């Protein structure tokens, strides 16, 4: 039961941030939901930093991992929204736009995760 509370508290914060990002960035472009991309890229950057941290400090309580990764980042990033936005572009015969959004999410998120790991490694070396 305690694990569920940690996940839930993280999810409240992650979903709230995702909603705010959507409100802020989605109106910028009419062709696709820019907020979803920002949320996914930011989430992948943060998960990269957290992966580096948890790899270096495996003794950190599993509750933090549940709170930050499963709860917060699980609700901040949104594969289902991304998927529906790409499919909607395809169904509206906007194949190039859909493919571009697909590639931005895929390669951007992978790159941000790697960047997050590198940022953590550099920061941990500078601080030690």
UniProtKB/Swiss-Prot annotation:
Name the residues that span the membrane.
5-25, 34-54, 67-87, 99-119
Q: How is its activity regulated?
A: Na(+) is not transported, but it plays an essential structural role and its presence is essential for fluoride channel function.
**Main subcellular location:** membrane
Catalytic activity, as annotated:
fluoride(in) = fluoride(out)
Enumerate the InterPro entries for this protein. FluC
Query: What Gene Ontology molecular-function terms does this entry list?
Result: fluoride channel activity; metal ion binding
Compartments where located: Cell inner membrane
Checking NCBIfam families in the record gives: crcB, PRK14196.1
Xref: HAMAP family: FluC
- Described function: Fluoride-specific ion channel. Important for reducing fluoride concentration in the cell, thus reducing its toxicity.
Write down what this protein is called: Fluoride-specific ion channel FluC
What organism is the protein native to? Answer: Haemophilus influenzae (strain 86-028NP)
